[in-house]
Amino acid sequence: MPASNFDAIQLAGNGTNDTPLNGFRVYTQSLDVASVAAATSAEQTFTVTGLATTDRVVVSKPSLTAGLGVVNARVSAANTLALTFMNASAGAIDPAAEIYTITAFRT
């Protein structure tokens, strides 16, 4: 779904290895995660229009799915969110589609 424009903020750091934060954007989008096999992790990709490869992302799954965790989030290509899911259970997990919150930080 469309998001608002990047909100401009500037943060002061200690100067040496700082990367200025130029803004952030919050997306809410329905993601339909494919089944994740037992005792494994798997990366899946989703289209999120507006993401750039230089963005850093934080993703919030809206509900608890026993045995399933989101263990990594990255922008793998322009407009593409890559999420790694870990299944710690003894059986496959196929979660229902949900509205995830994706916060992108632009540097």
Feature locations, PLM:
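Extracellular receptor-binding modules and their adjoining Ser/Thr/Gly/Asp/Asn-rich linkers
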Residues: P2-L51, L81, G91-T107
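Extended, low-complexity, turn-rich repeat/linker tracts enriched in Gly/Pro/Ser/Thr and Asp/Glu
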Residues: L64-G67, G91
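Glycan-recognition/cleft segments
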Residues: V70-V75
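Residue-level recognition of beta-strand termini and adjacent short loop/turns
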Residues: A77-N79
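Asparagine-centered strand-capping/turn motif at beta-strand->loop junctions
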Residues: F85-S89
